[in-house]
Amino acid sequence: DRVYQIDRGKRRLLGVVDGRRVKSLLRFFRDFGKERCAKIKVVCSDMWRPYLKVIEKKLPEALNVLDRFHIAKKLSEAVDQVRREEVKSLQKEGYEPILKKARYCFLKLLENLTDGQLDKLADITRYDLRTNRAYFLKEAFDGFWKYNSPQWARWFLRKWCARTMRSRLEPMKKFVRTLRKHEDLLMNYFKAGKTYN
């Protein structure tokens, strides 16, 4: 893992943490020094619990913002898990393999899909599939980042989470449980002026 300094559009590598281990991150903070650590106002991290604990301990005054990329990755993994389960289920029941070779149709941003992927996605979304429900929930979640008001963003997040928990899609529900555990850290994105991600 890498540690960067990001100031008003400037990005500078501060250090490389050896592997994904707590000891490595603790060593980074020790080497970085207490004085410099005290000057850190915002830190951007993923949701890995050991890192969150170290950041809370070593940077108690810093605002921890969850990285949008990691949240999007976890959500995409949940959608893909729904897709994989449904591929197996449809195969077992003897249906045509419509979801085969469609993985990236559900994982890529809509604007990054090729014409062929757009056609395949349009064809697939005509069916009543669990994968489609997961995909539409994923697309709807993107609206969270567009809010300017933290209060409205929190309202949206809670509504989206409640709707997703009713979806009967276990991988999506697991993602929601993770989000709910970190709701305050997620909302820090707005406290930080939507500039860190």
What kind of region is each of these model predictions?
Residues 1-4:
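Two-metal-ion RNase H-like nuclease active-site motif
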Residues 7-12, 26-27, 31-63, 69-73, ...:
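Acidic/histidine-rich catalytic cores and adjacent linkers
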Residues 71-92:
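Short alpha-helix plus adjacent loop in nuclease-associated cores
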